[in-house]
Amino acid sequence: FITAAFGIPQISTGDMLRAAIKAGTLLGLEAKKIIDEGGLVRDDIIIGMVKERIAQDDCKNGFLFDGFPRTLAQAEAMVEAGVDLDAVVEIDVPDSVIVDRMSGRRVHLASGRTYHVTYNPPKVEGKDDVTGEDLIQRDDDKEETVKKRLAVYHEQTEVLVDFYSKLEGEHAPK
């Protein structure tokens, strides 16, 4: 909705990383190992990818970050680069709900269609509605991986709420 209303692109580091993984790039292979273990890809890699992306023409009128920044270093790098944010939104969801939602997700790899075992189940359990092919659970959606990612979130990302609430001057979200 926001991207359509303002004619701006959504910038998702997750999507950028998944594209690199699918393409089998060196970054993609390195990122896959880290993501599958529930960790965060190194800040320097993410910051570089984001700076490259926001320099593209379609970002000249703005952009919507999705899942970025995730660490204090990433947020500070954006401030140092003069990237001003109009608003920052935190969606506060209990860990138990996140685990349930993510671990219940199933994907048809060829098409990208996404289902959920409880909230959006396929017509036939474990099968894509269109092709009848198998659905898979991505490694990063497995319960133990989701719990590790949440621990990383609480350790590294939660501090951003405080960072942005204290940011002042021209770089402060309005």
Swiss-Prot record:
GO CC entries: cytoplasm
Positions that bind AMP: 13, 18, 39-41, 67-70, 74, 138, 149
Catalyzed reaction equations: AMP + ATP = 2 ADP
Segments for region (NMP): 12-41
The keyword Kinase is annotated on this UniProt entry: yes
Enzymatic class: transferase
Pathway where this protein functions: Purine metabolism; AMP biosynthesis via salvage pathway; AMP from ADP: step 1/1
One Pfam family cited in the UniProt record for this chain: ADK_lid
GO biological process: AMP salvage
Residues holding ATP: 105, 114-115
Region of interest: LID: 104-141
Major localisation: cytoplasm
Purpose: Catalyzes the reversible transfer of the terminal phosphate group between ATP and AMP. Plays an important role in cellular energy homeostasis and in adenine nucleotide metabolism.
Protein name: Adenylate kinase
Organism: Neisseria polysaccharea
Gene name in the database record: adk
